[in-house]
Each structure stands twice: as structure tokens, then as C-alpha cells.
């Protein structure tokens, strides 16, 4: 799981 994707999900949710 890429940290970059986690950052985007944090902003969406």
C-alpha cells in the first residue's frame, strides 16, 4: 500500500 495513496484517501475521507 503506497503512502501517497493513503494521503489522498485521508483527504477524501
From Swiss-Prot:
Write out the coiled-coil annotation as residue ranges. none
Would the keyword Secreted be found if you checked this record's keyword annotation? yes
Q: Does the keyword Iron apply?
A: no
Question: In which compartments does the protein localize?
Answer: Secreted
Per the record, the GO terms for biological process are: defense response; killing of cells of another organism
What UniProt keywords are attached to this protein's entry?
Amidation, Amphibian defense peptide, Cytolysis, Hemolysis, Secreted
Where expressed (tissues)?
Expressed by the skin glands.
Which residues are annotated with the PTM Phenylalanine amide? Answer: 13
Write out the GO cellular component annotations. Answer: extracellular region
The job of this chain, per UniProt, is described as: Shows hemolytic activity.
Name of the protein in its database record: Hemolytic protein A1
Amino acid at each position: 500500500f503506497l503512502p501517497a495513496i493513503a494521503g489522498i484517501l485521508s483527504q477524501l475521507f
